[in-house]
């Protein structure tokens, strides 16, 4: 059984049988953590809607951080980061693979914005958190910029082609209007995503309905998020 809690914006807590995964928590109440189960904390990049210093107060086995979150001596002093905590931090760029725990593999993809996306394999499941890796197509932006964004997005996500992903947390950003459908639609066509949790919606949870009205074929795999603090449980046959 896999459990997930939507903390807010792009923050999720995912519970697998043998490990707990915390992604991009910066807002919302963190549920009680399971005692005796190792915690891995992920921060995809430094933007304030994806990262906050309070994560370092958690009793985590490891902190996996996008490389743009600089653990320089100056930052460590400013953040009052102990040597013990700093030793558990892994700074990751795109296209890296690490094993922070026995039986757990973390792969990264470059982002089209800042930092990285995370692909975690553990307990026979694969969980993907995109961070800000998205097809950012902005109406009114320079056409060349938008074309370059499309090229980079498709190149960065190519390693996911045909790959089974049991649970994917993907940006579905209403600020882009219908252009916000581009990213998740491409992800869902590219990879074998079993369950998709929308994120980065800025509280506009009804935007998922608009996405599904445009792409009804994705309804069976899309799990709408409707409120902060919402819990989800996925049985083995569902993910």
Enumerate the predicted regions with their spans.
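Core dinuclear metal-dependent hydrolase active-site scaffold
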Residues: 1-36, 87-164, 229-239
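Binuclear metal-ion centers of metallo-dependent hydrolases, dominated by the metallo-beta-lactamase
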Residues: 5-10, 84-98, 181-239
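A short, acidic, amphipathic alpha-helical segment used as a generic capping/interface helix at domain edges
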Residues: 152-158, 177-186
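Metal-dependent catalytic neighborhoods of phosphoester/phosphodiester hydrolases
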Residues: 52-60, 75-78, 206-215
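Active-site metal-binding motif and surrounding structural segment of the metallo-beta-lactamase
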Residues: 27-74, 158-169
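Active-site environment of divalent metal-dependent phosphoester hydrolases
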Residues: 28-30, 46-51, 70-74, 96-99, ...
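Glycine/small-residue-rich loop that forms an oxyanion/phosphate-binding "nest" at active or ligand-binding sites
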Residues: 64-96
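Structural motif
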Residues: 22, 42, 64, 127-130, ...
